[in-house]
Amino acid sequence: LAFVAGGAEAGTTGKITGRVLSDKKAPVLAVTCFLEGTRFGAYTNEQGQYTILNVPAGTYTLRFQRVGYEIKSVQGVVVSSDQTTTQDIVLGETAIQMQEVVVTAERPPVEVSVTSSQVSLTAKEIKALPVQELNDVVNLQAGVVDGHFRGGRKDEVQYQVDGVSANNAYDNSSSLRLDRSLLQEVQVISGTFDAEYGQAMSGVVNAVLKQGTEKFHLEGEGYLGGFLLSDPSVRLVSDQFQPGALASLQLTASGPLAKNTLFLLSGRYYHFEDYVKGTRLFVPTDSSDFENGIPHPTGDGKSVPLGYSSEWGGAAKLTNTSLHNTKLSYQAVWNVVDGKRMQYAYRFNPDGAPTQQTFAIFHGLDWNQILSKSTYFDLSFRQNYFDYNDYVYEDVFDPRYDAAGPARGDPGFEDGAFIQGVELNRFTQTTNAFLIKGSVVNQVNSIVQVKAGGELQFPAVSFGSPGTLVYTIVNGQQTLVRHVDDPPDYPGVKTYHPVLAATFAQAVVERPTLTFRGGLRLDYFDARSTVPSDPANPANSIAGAPPSEPVPTTAKFKLAPRLGIAFPIEKRAAVHFAYGHFYQYPSIGTIFTNSDYNTLNDLQAGGVSYGVLGNPDVQPEKTIQYEMGYKHAITDNLGADLTVFYKDIRNLLGVEFVQTYNDAEYARLTNVDFGDAVGFTLAIDHRRLGPVAVALDYTWMEALGNSSDPRETATRAEAGEDPRPRLAYFNWDQRHKLDLTVSMARSDDYSASIVLRAASGQPYTPVLESGFGNGQEPNSGRKPSGMVIDMRGEKTVKVKNTNMSVYARVYNLLDSKFLNGTVFNSTGSPYYSRFPESDQVTLNDPTRFYAPRRIELGVTFGM
């Protein structure tokens, strides 16, 4: 095989393979097969086979030509990350040059060679859905419940941008918010995944970003929107129609910058105001007479949104291919967000609530080098920087803290409402991580491909209170005292420097009768911290006890095998089996929170609670996944996929109670929690029925464990409940989930889509009587089921060389009030309580309902 120059980053490319035959069914040698508008191509060998490696994810026109044969082009060839696209073709012999024959490729309704559950959506498919951001796309997939993949905890998912981890090591969530305008492809792996992917136990989301184009291209989008409530009184708000609640403006330019250099630059501004409004009757510095129940409001009485968000975001890419067989690129993605989290308690004193500011940037260099016609390597360098602040005033010494005092309410005015003061809690979190990832790929022959590589991460994670405000008696009077880095009781902001590394090797064998994917991954983690040598003397302060000096944490090594097999049982049907071990080190924010054991210096038997102590020397959490499925392309446009899965979850973070030498007891994190998840998914995809397409995803699942949160056991013990581990449904367990998408489209004319999301109720813990019932089994009740419908309609027009469209999007079309939100423990209903007096604060809170109907009107253009 001969390959033409090309290159792209790891985790963003796939390959195209196939066979070229004559109209007499004989293989055709030396046919030129290339992707129009690119440098990617190959020649066929004696068997008529060709393979084009290292093709960036996207949609292409594949052209076949050779002297003595007709020229054919196949439009709409879709390439997905880390997957093989097969495109066979038949060329008719001819003695004269004939007009080119153009055919359109159709993605098969199921991919019979795929060995695990995964979905790849192209930019065109994403645009047609009523979604705006990456998370909207992810939550529509089978087996995903509000970010939980197949029953796992929310922090068990690896989010990647162009094949490199974009997770924040503090909580293992994505550092970025990605708008759909940036997405070339989204790959969601909810089953087992290759050895290349680590630091995840439940799933992988790989967002492939768009890149520069060979010709200059400019596109943009803008929309305005608001809320339209069917019955405001049910939601406890007064305004039925709230226009102007959100606005977005996005612009993207791409094209050639210089010879062999392409650029992409995209920017977006987005503003959102929540539908629940507050009234500024009070200001933080008001002086109400709380003893006599006499308020003294001095606010201006204006209506203001209790929650809002203003965001600037964007991306930049610069790609150069001047050097032979070399591709160098720089990319950056960023978000700047300023907003306020909705807190209904501040509805009359909105200026007393804290604001949140976020700055995130994910940027770096990529080097792709073709070493030979069948071998290439990728090397990526990234900085993942994330900064988050949550407080009312930036400076802890701001005199407005003294003037306002703590947030206070008066039940005589309105129970649960703060009418004076400000929130005194303060928090900041910064992650500055440097990542290196590299891999080498070799196409051994037309059947076997091998890949090996590794990655190294150096995160610096800081978090804590940037100054703690505490009221203390000084000279007989209540005085607001500042504590800045005053350990062990007020430690301030601390920085931690763990190291994560991994190496992997994997192979893919693709034959007409078998697809095999297998690999091994070796993970390394070192918290680079200390723990007490003897937990029974945690602060080395117990008289007469054996000494307990701090000792370094140990480095952890884990070897994880991965295996996937697909057997085509006929041309249009296949079965697959997948198995794998998946390890994940707990988030830095979890294991290091409250990890200074000097706080236990005065620990006495029967003493006060010190909370749950952190533990940086825990083992990695582990999940073993099993998956088996059957997929069948019933027709050229109708496919079905049935997959059964089981997850054995072990070594989850939980709480142990440690007995000290002086008969005291404290709680600390360790690997004691466990669980499992079992279920199946059914996907039916009808690509085309005239202009109509239908896709249905159904998930049945049962997810149980001994706790939904690492600190849950300690919480039960403090409440006087039985802390012993026992199986209960996870908080996010959901027996049934159904996603139905119906779309109708005519190319370059119109499109419309409706997405229906239906779900059975998640668990809750019932209460029998007011103040009683804590002994009820956790999560033994079920919330009501719910359904939400979203829709999108678009009309396209062409004005000279500009493609324009107008569209409307409606979220929660039927204005549903409930979808697995808050319920009252006495009734299991979100609407009423058996104990209205004790639950009055919650009954008055409209934020417990699902977000109301939201209408957006927008326009797009491209030229």
Language-model regions, residue ranges each:
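Signature of Gram-negative outer-membrane beta-barrel scaffolds
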Residues: G301, E423, L435, Q443, ...
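Transmembrane beta-barrel strands of outer-membrane/channel proteins
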Residues: A105, L218-G226, L265-Y269, Y330-V336, ...
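Periplasmic N-terminal accessory/gating domains of Gram-negative outer-membrane beta-barrel systems
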Residues: E70, Q75-T86, Q99-V204, V208-Q211, ...
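C-terminal beta-signal and adjacent terminal beta-strands/loops
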Residues: S747-S770, E794-M863
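Membrane-embedded beta-barrel scaffold of Gram-negative outer-membrane proteins
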Residues: D378, R382, H576, G580, ...
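Gram-negative outer-membrane beta-barrel transporters
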Residues: F525, D641-V655, A664-V767
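Transmembrane beta-barrel wall of Gram-negative outer-membrane proteins
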Residues: Q242-G339, T358-Y376, P561
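Periplasm-facing N-terminal accessory domains of Gram-negative outer-membrane beta-barrel systems
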Residues: A5-T104, P109
